[in-house]
């Protein structure tokens, strides 16, 4: 019996094109945006722009707001306090709205190739890994890393 797979992807230091390319190369069918606020200062990663790009590439887009990290969890993540992030996120996942979205996402992932999207490049530093552990422990996990955009250093050509 084939073990189902969940993909994760973060867009930190990546372009929209690199993220879409990584999703296509992995055969992802649905991008599950698990950001509480699907907004970004990075061009191409706000909800409407990202949805348009992935749909143009033949990939579905779904936003699961209740599976995002609430404000106090995001603050803990910025401080590097993974224990507090875990505590806050565990509480988020107990809410009825989150439980409903977890069931919806689980069902989707049992029938299609799904990637969980958030900002952090390293899934271990992100709530993507916490959601995986809670909801998909019986799935294989593949962390996609899109080509990075490395800023040029001053004085180099």
Predicted regions mapped to residue ranges:
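Residues lining hydrophobic/aromatic ligand-binding pockets adjacent to catalytic sites
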Residues: 1-157
